[in-house]
Amino acid sequence: EFIEVSEESFKGQWSVLCFYPADFTFVCPTELEDLQNEYAALKELGVEVFSASTDTHFTHKGWHDSSETIGKITYAMIGDPSQTLSRNFDVLNEVSGLADRGTFIIDPDGVVQAAEINAEGIGRDASTLVNKIKAAQYVRNNPGEVCPAKWQEGDETLKPSLDLVGKI
């Protein structure tokens, strides 16, 4: 089914927007499958997932219908042939016309809380994404606390203050 998605679609809920270069390629299906494997965990966190490339929605449908790997995907695949969304998120490679490999965590206010851009040949790990979302949600729900490196749900956080300066 085809749906219309706008920047308003990212408001009122946590969202992940995952740009990838192109359908029918090599690294992209491995990433999108990995994201699908974590989709239930993301939904439990109240997160909606959107993937996007500069392909058309017809190309997405063809890929979805012809690939066993991509056929498993149940989250939205955005077609951005006008390159507007890719350009707005500053992931458009103006030379190739393709989106860079970019991931954005967007809070319910529509504010980007985390952004990651990978080189074309480097795939992403969705389990790391799940942990970043948990950290972003924790910080939002616990003002005055921050999550240190390698933080996992249940770990101690930090409360920045003058007393903490130079003691970490």
Curated annotation (Swiss-Prot):
GO cellular component, one term: cytosol
Active-site residues (renumbered): C28 (cysteine sulfenic acid (-soh) intermediate)
Signal peptide coordinates: none
Domain Thioredoxin per the UniProt entry, residue ranges: 1-138
Entry keywords, A to Z: Antioxidant, Cytoplasm, Disulfide bond, Oxidoreductase, Peroxidase, Redox-active center
Stated role: Thiol-specific peroxidase that catalyzes the reduction of hydrogen peroxide and organic hydroperoxides to water and alcohols, respectively. Plays a role in cell protection against oxidative stress by detoxifying peroxides.
PANTHER family: ALKYL HYDROPEROXIDE REDUCTASE C (PTHR10681:SF121), THIOREDOXIN PEROXIDASE (PTHR10681)
Protein name: Alkyl hydroperoxide reductase C
Native organism: Ferdinandcohnia aciditolerans (strain JCM 32973 / CCTCC AB 2017280 / YN-1)
